[in-house]
From Swiss-Prot:
Keywords per UniProt: Electron transport, Heme, Iron, Membrane, Metal-binding, Mitochondrion, Mitochondrion inner membrane, Respiratory chain, Transmembrane, Transmembrane helix, Transport, Ubiquinone
Name by which UniProt lists this protein: Cytochrome b
Transmembrane segments: 33-53, 77-98, 113-133, 178-198, 226-246, 288-308, 320-340, 347-367
Entry similarity comment: Belongs to the cytochrome b family.
Ranges in a coiled coil: none
GN (gene name): MT-CYB
Subunit architecture: The cytochrome bc1 complex contains 11 subunits: 3 respiratory subunits (MT-CYB, CYC1 and UQCRFS1), 2 core proteins (UQCRC1 and UQCRC2) and 6 low-molecular weight proteins (UQCRH/QCR6, UQCRB/QCR7, UQCRQ/QCR8, UQCR10/QCR9, UQCR11/QCR10 and a cleavage product of UQCRFS1). This cytochrome bc1 complex then forms a dimer.
Job description of the protein: Component of the ubiquinol-cytochrome c reductase complex (complex III or cytochrome b-c1 complex) that is part of the mitochondrial respiratory chain. The b-c1 complex mediates electron transfer from ubiquinol to cytochrome c. Contributes to the generation of a proton gradient across the mitochondrial membrane that is then used for ATP synthesis.
């Protein structure tokens, strides 16, 4: 008798995705982050669902409803902080996942890569509208500043901003629609994740060497299910430690002050995971130029498959490219730090240099290094 998991229409899909999937035998722990992202998404949807049961998307009660969740709802405080810190863990896994794909040349699977970039944009949008919901000072002013950037678009800018706001300022209509978007987007993301996996399994996983591994595959279960479980336990351990010991480490103290349109916080800044893009935005003195640079800092990822000049897929055996890759990581961290600093000397010039280096590395230096490596290997 054939096994039900190989014959049942639904089980067959799950089987070919998580059980009998042929997987390269040499993939390292850097490949754990895909499953960790899936875990983060599930945790965010579940904690978010319970928060939505008690939250009220209304300007007069939003802030107090979050306080009510933390004070009066059974274990509301842990659900709220798991959700807030879960978002941080989500972005740590996300950036690591993208970094790993860049290093090992996974971007050559173009459909998987492009859907991944679309997923990144949607997760960023979800996180942005979610940050507005507690209706603290930073929520309100973050929403005002970031949505206002659209007014830089010629002709239709101002109309577009008022259309998104649902009025002449960030108010009740804005909060309601942001809550709606924050609720619906994770489900669209889940559907896109399925498409992302579908395209990934068309070509199969890459491996650290970048060499096709068709002759050396092992089943996903039990080898990688157990490996993913270890990663999952570590992720949950770090998340719980953060949530229970330092729940506000990555938050902004200004968000514990109710939103007040009449007083502007001294430093308006987004959550830490947007600071690199915010630093790039601020480094250009022109509004439209800044907005374009902000968009390009993310959309540049779509160009990366076209900028692949190396004859080798992975950076494992390419020392020049490795050096530039780690320079890019250091530059990303520098931008993140600069985004959280006030606009004054020397932070302005450091931010501008880091922004120039970011685009220079991706568009010019890394493709050139790959060509030099090809020449050295007489390819």
């Amino acid at each position: 008798m054939t096994n039900i998991r190989k014959t049942h229409p639904l089980m067959k899909i799950l089987n070919s995705t998580f059980i009998d999937l042929p997987t390269p035998s040499n993939i390292s722990s850097w490949w754990n982050f895909g499953s960790l992202l899936g875990l983060c998404l599930i945790m965010q949807i579940l904690t978010g669902l319970f928060l939505a049961m008690h939250y009220t998307p209304d300007t007069s009660t939003a802030f107090s409803s979050v306080a009510h969740i933390c004070r009066d709802v059974n274990y509301g405080w842990i659900i709220r902080y798991l959700h807030a810190n879960g978002a941080s863990m989500f972005f740590i896994c996300l950036y690591t996942h993208i970094g790993r794909s860049l290093y090992y040349g996974s971007h050559t699977s173009q459909e998987t890569w492009n859907i991944g970039v679309l997923l990144l944009l949607m997760i960023m949008a979800t996180a942005f509208v979610g940050y507005v919901l507690p209706w603290g000072q930073m929520s309100f002013w973050g929403a005002t500043v970031i949505t206002n950037l659209l007014s830089a678009i010629p002709y239709i800018g101002n109309t577009l901003v008022e259309w998104i706001w649902g009025g002449f300022s960030v108010d009740k209509a804005t909060l309601t629609r942001f809550f709606t978007f924050h609720f619906i987007l994770p489900f669209i993301i889940t559907a896109l994740v399925a498409v992302h996996l579908l395209f990934l399994h068309e070509t199969g996983s890459n491996n650290p060497t970048g060499i096709p591994s068709n002759m050396d595959m092992i089943p996903f279960h039990p080898y990688y299910t157990i490996k993913d479980m270890l990663g999952a336990f570590l992720l949950i351990l770090i998340l719980l430690a953060m949530t229970l010991l330092t729940p506000d480490l990555l938050g902004d103290p200004d968000n514990y002050t109710p939103a007040n349109p009449l007083s502007t916080p001294a430093h308006i800044k987004p959550e830490w995971y947007f600071l690199f893009a915010y630093a790039i935005l601020r480094s250009i003195p022109n509004k439209l130029g800044g907005v374009l640079a902000l968009l390009l800092s993310i959309l540049i990822l779509l160009l990366i498959p076209m900028l692949q000049t190396s004859k080798q897929r992975s950076m494992m055996f390419r020392p020049f490219s490795q050096l530039l890759f780690w320079t890019l990581i250091a530059d990303f961290l520098t931008l993140t730090w600069i985004g959280g600093q006030p606009v004054e000397h020397p932070y302005i010039i450091v931010g501008q240099l880091a922004s120039i280096l970011y685009f220079l590395l991706i568009l010019v230096l890394m493709p050139m290094a790959s060509l030099i490596e090809n020449k050295l290997l007489k390819w």
